[in-house]
Amino acid sequence: MNRYTTIRQLGDGTYGSVLLGRSIESGELIAIKKMKRKFYSWEECMNLREVKSLKKLNHANVVKLKEVIRENDHLYFIFEYMKENLYQLIKERNKLFPESAIRNIMYQILQGLAFIHKHGFFHRDLKPENLLCMGPELVKIADFGLAREIRSKPPYTDYVSTRWYRAPEVLLRSTNYSSPIDVWAVGCIMAEVYTLRPLFPGASEIDTIFKICQVLGTPKKTDWPEGYQLSSAMNFRWPQCVPNNLKTLIPNASSEAVQLLRDMLQWDPKKRPTASQALRYPYFQVGHPLGSTTQNLQDSEKPQKGILEKAGPPPYIKPVPPAQPPAKPHTRISSRQHQASQPPLHLTYPYKAEVSRTDHPSHLQEDKPSPLLFPSLHNKHPQSKITAGLEHKNGEIKPKSRRRWGLISRSTKDSDDWADLDDLDFSPSLSRIDLKNKKRQSDDTLCRFESVLDLKPSEPVGTGNSAPTQTSYQRRDTPTLRSAAKQHYLKHSRYLPGISIRNGILSNPGKEFIPPNPWSSSGLSGKSSGTMSVISKVNSVGSSSTSSSGLTGNYVPSFLKKEIGSAMQRVHLAPIPDPSPGYSSLKAMRPHPGRPFFHTQPRSTPGLIPRPPAAQPVHGRTDWASKYASRR
């Protein structure tokens, strides 16, 4: 033992304690199992079951016994070091394992168990604590302290393994059991790895049998006659239970996993498959080298690789042909396609994996050991191909068809990603906007109330171009919006008496005034500075900057103004008792209530209704009270 140094204690068992050590020569980490009882001869040591079994077992999924040392009547086993056991791996897990990782773990356990059974031993104490791991990628069977040779003669002791993983024949105190008890324990461990909880957590042996009955249902006498003999021998009365569906108890297990579980958890040990038979179940036939690292990552990567490698006729996308560089829409299609083709992780189980494999028969022929796996999924695939083709036939991509596997028409434009505005097809609305802009430029400037409400794309405030903005594109000209806004506008008066209009003119009008484009009125300006800016704008319309259309570029309708401060609150005013004498002469010029009040010059443009003249300012003031007197 002077060739090893001990670092710390890893665990303490019934027959010995385990220490973490290091080899002084190589620096390799090792596990030292120190037996609690003393051994006074080598013959006594060599008769130990653990030594007998481990001397004969050399397998990748069986923990390796490096050396046996007897020193001062103490016996030490030197094992290879493993980071953790399966119980610790399950306990530290905060989310469920992917099925590919579970399949890999169970495959390694059954491989090691088949090797042990083949060499004439059965373990008798399989539980998560006795399965040593280096993460989920590598699992090895350890602790052969209770191992027995299969050819050894009964009776055996009735206490074997931890109660939760004990087979029903052992719970009923049978003394004639064999390797099927290990298969039962593997079934219990498999369910626990899926759910992260024990399947039969009984508080006692009888309670464990009750737990088994609640899951599997009460066995019939014809199904397991030996079980009824054992129960009558110990005066045990079977509870009457209805079997539960394992799929409902383990919802994240596939149908192949449930099939394997159901067979390993048979009441009758003769009906359970052997470990080598379990390895041939469809659950392990997944078309890749078994025992490799997690299948889930391969499943999620295969669709991407297939899309990048595949080059076919026009319905498929080629990865940037060198001779003819594609236009921008096509480059966007390819980039979006790779994103959409990634299946979600929680849906990658058999269906997604099979879809990706059916797309690429070359991969299937290379990797798959068996010719046909999951036949029902193959039958579904052509239908999904047809629907994908029809989906893109009309040049439309609906947002619900997010997952595609490479079938996209060349002429379509991918607009699935609504977060990217460059992908939106603005062509119909832009052509309509350009026609209207030409019509407006050919005619004189058109100023009517509908144009204010029709929030068509126009130039933003302070800029000279007419590129449509996102806000203006999304607000469409609908009759309900127009009528609702008109009622909102006509219902509220902005006239506040007692305020000097002349003093309300801004000292720096350059910030408020905009280049004289009569259609910039539909764009929203910056934050209003209260009622004074509104009145000053109206004053400037009436006095200084009245254009040929009677509307300046900086006019902002009141229904678009943000109500800020106490001066911008909606105020209903009483009639003014003593209006100015000059106001009475303007009552005849008051516009019709149903018509907008802006002044436009008469023109012969078809489809436009001539408007009555707007009220002219008197002494620099607009008669707002006379305008809205009838509306009060």
Swiss-Prot record:
Modified residues (Phosphoserine): S161
Post-translation changes: Autophosphorylated on serine and threonine residues. Phosphorylation at Thr-157 increases kinase activity.
Entry-annotated residues carrying Phosphotyrosine: Y159
Cofactor: Mg(2+)
SMART domains, A to Z: S_TKc
Residue positions binding ATP: L10, G11, D12, G13, T14, Y15, G16, S17, V18, K33
Related illness: Endocrine-cerebroosteodysplasia: Previously unidentified neonatal lethal recessive disorder with multiple anomalies involving the endocrine, cerebral, and skeletal systems. Juvenile myoclonic epilepsy 10: A form of juvenile myoclonic epilepsy, a subtype of idiopathic generalized epilepsy generally characterized by afebrile seizures with onset in adolescence (rather than in childhood) and myoclonic jerks, which usually occur after awakening and are triggered by sleep deprivation and fatigue. EJM10 is an autosomal dominant seizure disorder with variable manifestations, even within families. Affected individuals have febrile, myoclonic, tonic-clonic, or absence seizures, although several seizure types can occur in the same individual.
UniProt similarity note: Belongs to the protein kinase superfamily. CMGC Ser/Thr protein kinase family. CDC2/CDKX subfamily.
Name the record gives this protein: Serine/threonine-protein kinase ICK
Organism of this sequence: Homo sapiens (Human)
Lineage: Eukaryota, Metazoa, Chordata, Craniata, Vertebrata
Gene behind this protein: CILK1
